[in-house]
UniProtKB/Swiss-Prot annotation:
Catalysed transformations (reactions): L-rhamnopyranose = L-rhamnulose
Protein name from the UniProt record: L-rhamnose isomerase
Organism lineage: Bacteria, Pseudomonadati, Pseudomonadota, Gammaproteobacteria, Enterobacterales
Cofactor note: Binds 1 Mn(2+) ion per subunit.
Pathway(s) served: Carbohydrate degradation; L-rhamnose degradation; glycerone phosphate from L-rhamnose: step 1/3
Organism of provenance: Salmonella typhi
EC number(s) per entry: 5.3.1.14
Annotated family: Belongs to the rhamnose isomerase family.
Entry binding sites for Mn(2+): H262, D294, D296
Assembly mode: Homotetramer.
Tagged with keyword Magnesium: no
Keyword Isomerase on entry: yes
């Protein structure tokens, strides 16, 4: 430890102690909060099923930065590079299209064996795994419907895919000793004015009930469902709306997924956390950065990211909220995108843990809103960066922008050689 870092650390401890915060306890709490990194940033949501196929489902990955992963070996190598530069506990979130097989596998036929390499890799890297059925980028989703499809055979295909995905998810949890959160998101919707909005939702309700009918140990598997306001090609009607999934998660007691980009631009998920937690047992968060729409830009340390972290910490939701990331930017170095976004999420959590919440709550309860605002603003100037640097030091990761040197070296030696 350098003398400069030691001095900054000691000063930070004193400054935070003055407002009643134990920084060592804050770091212990931070080590209880894993962030689930999403594998699809590494290859622009291509997967291994049909890497040259088109990305569909009303989502887009824009840009053509060189060096994207072309297979599982490259993707895992890129992930390892990113993991080395991010302090503290992490998880990895996989989509079904990241299976590995020597022969083609239909999505309704995926099995745990197709993800064995991921499990062994996760064990070696001390990671938990999360999972997602992939209900897009497939011929049977081309007309914009999956679990709510009017054709019973096509609908059953997607039901069977989700059921198979749940078995994979339970396998992850059983093998790794930590529950896998499996999130169901479907692109189902219509481009223009929709006359019958009810029937597709009735079909979706029945399909989801069949999907979750097989029981799994919650120590191994957790179901989550995710809404969306609209997607490209589904601007006028989305079957799986917020109201639909809020009702479903409440009535079936599944987890509810809140994606930062899946609501109207004037809405924020930080305000939805406390409301949803009154009705559902768990929340899955997809922290992202929507720019005018669900653009999935890299997460910043901005007001909304901070507000999300603060909601988790202020209400002690550590065991009920699962933090995941969801962005995919192909215009910048993909390893750097992982590092920037994940470190920012962890910084936000640390800043929330360093807040004198009890004092602020007392001021609020007494009606002293002047002092509440003053303290919130003064808190921003306290030396949280010194605490972050100590956290990085303890986890053998670069504290400042030095991590970028490692990414540049990796880009020169590895990524630049990919055609």
């Amino acid at each position: 430890m350098t003398t400069q870092l030691e001095q900054a650390w000691e000063l930070a401890k004193q400054r935070f102690a003055a407002v009643g915060i134990d920084v060592e306890e804050a770091l212990r709490q931070l080590d209880r909060l894993p962030v689930s990194m999403h594998c699809w940033q590494g290859d622009d949501v291509a997967g291994f099923e049909n890497p040259e196929g088109s990305l569909t489902g009303g989502i887009q990955s824009t840009g053509n930065y060189p060096g994207k992963a072309r297979n599982a070996t490259e993707l895992r190598a890129d992930l390892e590079q990113a993991l080395r530069l991010i302090p503290g506990p992490k998880r990895l979130n996989l989509h079904a299209i990241y299976l590995e097989s020597d022969t083609p596998v239909a999505r309704d036929q995926i099995k745990p064996e197709h993800f064995k390499n991921w499990v062994e890799w996760a064990k070696a890297n001390r990671l938990g795994l999360d999972f997602n059925p992939t209900c897009f980028s497939h011929p049977l989703s081309a007309d914009g419907f999956t679990l709510s499809h009017p054709d019973a055979k096509i609908r059953q295909f997607w039901i069977d895919h989700c059921k198979a995905s749940r078995r994979v998810s339970a396998y992850f949890g059983e093998q790794l000793g930590t529950p896998s959160v499996m999130n169901i998101w479907i692109p189902d919707g219509m481009k223009d004015i929709t006359v019958d909005r009810l029937a597709p939702r009735q079909r979706l309700l029945e399909a989801l009930d069949e999907v979750i009918s097989e029981k799994f140990d919650p120590a191994h598997h957790i179901d989550a469902v995710e809404s969306k306001l609209f997607g490209i090609g589904a601007e006028s009607y989305t079957v799986g709306s917020n109201e639909f999934y809020m009702g479903y998660a409440t009535s079936r007691q599944t987890a509810l997924c809140l994606d930062a980009g899946h609501f109207h631009p004037t809405e924020v998920i930080s305000d939805k956390i406390s409301a949803a937690m009154l009705y559902v047992p768990r929340l899955l968060l997809h922290v992202s950065r929507p720019v005018r729409w669900d653009s999935d830009h890299v997460v910043l340390l901005d007001d909304e990211t901070q507000a999300i972290a603060s909601e988790i910490v202020r209400h002690n939701l550590f065991d009920r909220v699962h933090i995941g990331l969801d962005f995919f930017d192909a215009s910048i170095n993909r390893v750097a995108a992982w590092v920037i976004g994940t470190r920012n999420m962890k910084k936000a959590l640390l800043r929330a843990l360093l807040e004198p919440t009890d004092q602020l709550r007392q001021l609020e309860a007494s009606g002293d809103y002047t002092a509440r605002l003053a303290m919130l603003e003064e808190q921003k100037s306290l030396p949280w960066q010194a605490v972050w640097e100590m956290y990085c030091q303890r986890h053998d990761t670069p504290a400042g922008s030095q991590w970028l040197d490692s990414v540049r070296t990796y880009e020169k030696e590895i990524l630049s050689k990919r055609s």
